[in-house]
Structures are given as structure tokens and as C-alpha cells.
Amino acid sequence: MDCHKEKLNEFQKKYVHSPMSKRECEACHLRHGKIAVLSLREREERRLCYTCHSQMGLNMDKMANVHTALKQGMCVPCHNPHASENKSLLKKTGSEQCFTCHKQATFMRAKRHKPLADGCLTCHSAHGSPYKDNLRKQEVELCQSCHNFTANNFRKAHKDYPVQKGKCTGCHTPHSSTNDKLLRESVHAPLNLGQCASCHKPVTDPNALGVIALDGKLCYTCHKK
């Protein structure tokens, strides 16, 4: 630290990385240099971190989906390697850390999913997951953590929609939308042409949607098999 006095302020922060708090700089750096100007002991950053965080390394090597930065071998896009005011040595707090890479505008439209306000980690794993998009559970199972699919209001709202055959994100965006119920932005061609009757019968039909045919049969009248 005699030369790197600019790092002394790091010791005043709330959370200090264990090797640094013990002044064990050589746990990560080589005294005389080896790789680039950082003189790191490992060429790939995450492998260096795994020398101490070994269980994390074992877990990530088995994961089907790994956070992009970590997959590219980097930990410092999210974590400060020396010290931070934030838990887990994060550079920013909560979702603000995620918005460093993920464009915030996509998440800030008028209608917002409640878990978004609670934080991205409500639905996503920070490092990796067996599931697509680093979700904590399979998509439908994850949605059921908050939404009771057997409740009367849910069943009524989805009556005659083939929800059992698809995923929630087929119709809803998981983050934010300009539409009520977080419905996706999509204008079906017949609707765009004002041809509602090409799919729907008069409103007196007992079927809630009043569609000409159920399930995929209706779609195949235009979209050939």
C-alpha cells in the first residue's frame, strides 16, 4: 500500500473484500507482474475469483444458463474487487446494478410488473440458472408463485384462452408494458385491417371470445400447416 495510496480510501467502505482487509494483495495479484497491468494470478478473471469462491465455480460450470458477464469470464461488471458500500461488493444497489447493462427504458413503461419494483432477483438468479433467462423456476411455475391459477378471477379472465398449452409470456410481457394486464404490443393482421369477423362471431355467441373455431384450428384458416 506504500505505492498504491489511492486504495487506502477503500478500507473506509462498509464492505471490504477479505483478502484486501487482511492486506493480502498477493492472493489475487503477482508481485512482479504477469498478465497485463493488473498482474493477476489468472488470465481469466472469473477463474481467479473461483480460487476462493470454489463452490460458485462448481455450480456455474453445471448451469445450463449463465449470466452473460460471468459467461464471458468477468465478475467486475457487477462487483468491486476491493471494497464497496453495498452488500456482496456490488457496484450499485438492487436493479440499478442490472440497468448498467440492461436498457432501463424497456422496464419503465407505464404498466409495470410488481416484482420489478421489488428487484430483478425476485424472478432471476444473479449468476446462473438451469432455466432460460436465468429464471429461478420454470416460467409457468415462477408465475404461479404469485398468481393463483385456480382463483376465480384468474379463470374468468382467461376463459376460452388455451393457456394450458403455452407460456404466460406468449401474451404478457414480464417487465412492463403500455397496455393493461402487461399485454404485449401486437396487432393481428385482420384486426389491423378492421376485419374482426374473420375470427369472431357476433357478441351473442356463448363462447367468451366468440371465435369461429377453437384452439389452433382458427389459426390454420390463414396460417397453413
Place the predicted regions along the sequence by residue.
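Short sequence/structural segments immediately N-terminal
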Residues: M1-K225
